[in-house]
Amino acid sequence: MKRIAMLAAACVIAVPAFAQNVATVNGKPITQKSLDEFVKLVVSQGATDSPQLREQIKQEMINRQVFVQAAEKDGVAKQADVQTEIELARQGILVRALMADYLQKHPVTDAQVKAEYEKIKKEQAGKMEYKVRHILVEDEKTANDLLAQVKSNKNKFDDLAKKNSKDPGSAERGGDLGWAPATNYVQPFAEAVTKLKKGQLVDKPVQTQFGWHVIQVDDTRPVEFPAMDQVRPQLEEMLRQQTLANYQKQLREQAKIQ
């Protein structure tokens, strides 16, 4: 086994430089290194490294080289708009690389995640969420007619919503919007919801940009804040974005901008 390993190493050392190219296109080499980098990029996005993948990428690199050479031969690469796109692409690559490098050097810590979690949890303390149902119609008269029918018999709400509501997302469920904090809704819908207690119906229809609403709150409960592990990925991403925003602000303050 040791002898085989030594022979393999010797073969690698003895390989001439041209053998490190996986292909050439009109004399232009496609190197093993560039293929490996391309494969690494694709694998980082979820693909599995395999001979089939490497062959596909190799053919893609050949195709690209064929097109690039044709573009250069025809003078396309020298066109002003193409040069602008190339420069914008170069800038984008550099910006992404800079951000990735900065985040690697300034990673989000567990302490930061915990502090952010506790901060948001404190802000949400005492907040309520509501189980709401509504009937959406186009005009006030229809809304008033429906409201009167519901007031006479709340059991009618389900059927009236199914037959009359213009909200396709909730009509088939009898107007049920499920559980949500009032902030999920537009004003003045949200304001109307917060004024209602469990089982209450609005006194009059509420108008929004969507039309006229007959609103009923079926139930209320305190917002249940998720465990930290459940929201850790979102918190980490939010903190990374904050880190980058602060870095950008720092760079702009240091730059001479006229």
Curated annotation (Swiss-Prot):
It holds the Pfam family Rotamase_3. It comes from the Bacteria. Residues 127-219 form the PpiC domain. InterPro entries: PPIase_dom_sf, PPIase_PpiC, PPIase_PpiC_CS, PrsA_foldase. Gene3D superfamilies: 1.10.8.1040, 3.10.50.40. It catalyses: [protein]-peptidylproline (omega=180) = [protein]-peptidylproline (omega=0). It is an enzyme of class 5 (isomerase). Its EC number is 5.2.1.8. Residues 1-19 form the signal peptide. Keywords: Isomerase, Rotamase, Signal. GO terms for molecular function: peptidyl-prolyl cis-trans isomerase activity. Belongs to the PpiC/parvulin rotamase family. This is Probable parvulin-type peptidyl-prolyl cis-trans isomerase. It comes from Bordetella pertussis (strain Tohama I / ATCC BAA-589 / NCTC 13251). The lineage of its organism: Bacteria, Pseudomonadati, Pseudomonadota, Betaproteobacteria, Burkholderiales.
